[in-house]
Structure formats: C-alpha cells, structure tokens
Amino acid sequence: QATDEKLVEGLVAEVERAGRIFLTGAGRSGLVSRFFAMRLMHCGYQVSMVGEIVTRSIVGGDLLIVVSGSGGTESLLPFVKKAKSVGARVAIVSMKGKSPMAELADLVCQMGSQDEYSFVTVQGMPMGTVFELSTLIFLEAIISRIVLAKGLDDDKMRALHANLE
C-alpha cells in the first residue's frame, strides 16, 4: 500500500523547520529510528538520540520524532509529554492513527491502512516486522526527498560520516 504523499511532505516540513531533531523508539522501532537519525545527520541536521548520555535538553522549536508501532509504548510516552511541555513539536510514526502519543502529536504518520492494526500477518515475518520495514522505507523516502531538495551528493554526505570506526 502506498503511503499518503501528504505524510511525506508533512514530515519533511517538520524536519526543515526544526531547530534540532531528537529521535526515539523502543526495541526494533528504536533501531529504525537510529537508521533515520544517522541519515538526517548525513544531511547536515543537528540530531540526537533520546537516552544517549550526550543528548542535550529539548526546547521549543525542536522536533521529537517517535517510532512506535502501537503509539502507546509506556517508556516513550513521558518523552512526548516532556517535549510538548517545553514547546517542542512531536511527530509520531505508528501503525495506529489513534493512540496516547497520537493524541499529543503535531503530526501522526500512520503506516498502512486506517485499520487499528493495519498490517496483515506475513508468514515468516513475526510480530512487528512488516511495520518496521514499512517505516524504514517511509523514512528513507523522507531522506530521498531531502537529498534531492538540498542537492546533496554522496561526497557531501560521506564527509559527515563517522571516521572513527
């Protein structure tokens, strides 16, 4: 199923207007958020992963992006509340359009259909695999849009890649 183009445009706009970008997710969704954080950094944005020891305070004008299949992950909800309380914007990438996090978010990027849990079970792809893969592709589409809009090439992005590996 194709993801609504308005979601792509909406998240690109949120990223573009953000002072700094903070990302979080739990479990495998957290890994997907790390993939996106790395690419945003390659595109020149100031990016932090929530929970890292060197992560600064979120403030008004910043953006928190949360990847949560359910939109109700108990360990992530306080981050959403804190971000909102200081005037930061919040974008949620989730399977559910209605959830505790979605109620607080400025932008909800629902993957799949409008059903509560929209992904069919695929044999050999347990639990949230289809959501995680769909989210990864969606977020890579965001990066593609940014790369094209900013005229970035591999050399510019590679110059920002870690060299202490």
Feature-to-residue mapping (PLM):
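Generic alpha-helical secondary structure signal
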Residues: 5-9, 74, 155
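A short, well-structured juxtamembrane/interface segment
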Residues: 1-17
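Glycine-rich phosphate-binding loops that contact phosphosugars or nucleotide phosphates
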Residues: 20-137, 143-144
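Structural signal for hydrophobic packing residues in well-ordered secondary-structure cores
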Residues: 1-3, 19, 146, 150
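A short, charged, Gly/Pro-tolerant segment at domain boundaries
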Residues: 141, 147-165
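Amphipathic alpha-helical interaction segments
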Residues: 10-13, 31, 159
